[in-house]
């Protein structure tokens, strides 16, 4: 299989590099460079001309290879990122909370946000290249340091977006690479210290950008207690990103990226828990438990983009390694939980992606492509448990059980679509994709997509679409467990059922409107309905802070979103609201995870809320810049995640507000390298709220939102 993929890639690379098409006299596309001849001498450019050429190919890629065509699109540019209260120190998963339909969850849920109440079914793309998901680490593996702009696409997606379909986080890297960079020091509450550095430049036909960040804090995860100072919650993290591009000639650009993230976390302790009494003395304190986790994520990719006449292509090869290691407290975990499980998950993935767009005529743009990945996973649950005698007595003589599984699986998808401009203000985009999955189960699906985009009058856009989706489980999270190994131990499951996890299949309908009310004021509304079979969900079952997946037989989601945005000169004000309901019934895979036979029986015959569902969510913010001074404020609201037996209850609603004030200074003679000072507050009003009550389906422990934190930042350009 690997040889086949390699051979296909070489052939396509050769064809893409050498493809030429005659220019048509009637071509009206405004893409820069479309009127250039198919054969050009090698170009070596520097300075602004290189930046302009890169910007031209970036625009061609985004316009021709990555159209949004009826998907609900929420964009955040560099200015938006800088005006957030924490600026570029805002974690990526906190940035998206300011988008309608995105709700807050704990880091253990990874990512700690949900798009339209779905589990972690989010696809990440960097410059159009799909970044494969990992094994659900406890922190955001991507930062915002390298982000030039980003968009969240959801709803009815065009056919090139497959597999992870709740949302597509489409990131475009920074593109202004003057010789220079920034030094940044950020820190404050909970002994937080986070220095970072960026540097970018160019030479000849190449440009590059590097960024690195270190973080240490005494609040790494959501605290298990409502106290101002979390107990056993330290973290240290390192993150690196590197980007480069080189023009091979005037129409061919080679791009290369690499990134790394390593995170170490203490697992927060719950106060007041009592030992079970089967092992060790009953005088132990749960505040002294010492559980830890170490996560790693590394990726690298190379992409060749061509932009010739009526044809655009991009071929990319990528690799990704991810691992998590949950390390228990061998003594205390046995005393409090009757099990101490060392859980290791490793995943090595290699892949190939190709996208092409051909402007066949003024009315039709044809697009096609494929993606294939090969993944090898290793999952080990090295559990120390206590034996149980035939009469039910737990024996205080620990034994070790090694539940180990490895698997090499693959996924392949191919798509084709036609963007048909029926009239200048009416576009019909039709497409179809085919996906084949071969992991712990084998399955495939043909998924048609159709969407209509209509501009009835100036400043008004309507879209309506319907799509079929095919979502495979994450191989590392869907690994089966050998339940027989745990017979007659304290880990023997109460439900001896472990049917394999299947891919989700769904039909998605989305309708939306965007209206420019005034020159500086826009509003939008969107409604959607999704119905699926084998609906995927996940949770943290047992006593290790790792996610496992399972299926509901049936599920549906429906909702409505509203947004309002005002931007004029230095003032920006926005507000978002979403009302959403997501329900499912009948757990049909990994049933043993549920733990309670009564709860499983109830779920078999009743629709219940999905664990990640919140009925009402909202976000709002404002920022203002006056000369060299700026201030910003934002906030989120949630009606509460699910709780209780079969998720029939929910946690209390909550709000969190953040604010910042800052100023630009020009202490150096040149005046063009400002020094920036910023003072920010997280949870400004110190609201105490619980995210997870540890009583719903697949909940690990109580998780509270952060208490008020005060932070300072100094940034110097150089």
Describe the predicted segments one by one.
Residues 200, 245-247, 607-718:
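Conserved C-terminal beta-signal and adjacent last beta-strands/turns
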